Design a protein with these regions (language model features):
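Residues immediately within or flanking Cys/His clusters that coordinate Zn2+
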Residues: 3, 21
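Cys/His-rich microdomains that often coordinate metals
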Residues: 10-13, 31
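Conserved N-terminal substructure of TIR/SEFIR domains
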Residues: 144-160
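Short cysteine-rich clusters marking metal-coordination/redox-active sites
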Residues: 6-9, 24-27
Length: 160
């Protein structure tokens, strides 16, 4: 059986055959997983996730694009593109100890209206769709907060 690493902490996920979600035995997060039907695809996912965790979002997105080109119905690859587009890294919340998303790239565009996110929802099953929506709502709240803060900042000039 394939070993899939947690998107949040890097621990091994508890996999159940045929399931589209898994629970991390270390941090307890429930998350979506790719279809486990192809070893080549799983290796590509592993490499893309490693790059994304290192905040190499453009390189990771390139690998996710390759996966999407080869496997058009793979919701997890589209989700990887979304995470890269918004520069999502999961960090420890000092208050709760849980992993929460942080955005390294801000955008005026809503994650809920993103074309790749629409592909995620279209290609995901019911269980995975619920997890994707919950994570997207969390990311959307962060994005809105960033936009609100930037709207209240004084304009400034930069001289080089």
């Amino acid at each position: 059986m394939a070993i899939i690493k947690c998107k949040m902490c890097g621990g091994e996920l508890i996999l159940i055959d045929g399931a589209s979600t898994a629970e991390c035995e270390f941090c307890g997060s429930v998350q979506t997983i790719p279809n486990l039907d192809d070893e080549k695809k799983l290796i590509q996912f592993e490499r893309a996730e490693r790059l994304r965790k290192q905040c190499e979002f453009d390189k990771a997105a390139g690998i996710y694009e390759t996966i999407v080109a080869d496997y058009r119905q793979e919701a997890e690859a589209y989700w990887g593109l979304v995470l890269c587009k918004y520069g999502i890294e999961y960090v420890d919340d000092p208050a709760t100890g849980k992993k929460i998303p942080t955005c390294h790239r801000s955008s005026f565009d809503s994650i809920m209206e993103d074309g790749d996110f629409e592909q995620v929802l279209e290609n995901a099953d019911v269980m995975a769709r619920k997890v994707y929506r919950e994570e997207a709502k969390q990311i959307e709240e962060i994005r809105k907060g960033i936009i609100a803060v930037s709207a209240n900042e004084e304009p400034y000039d930069i001289f080089i």
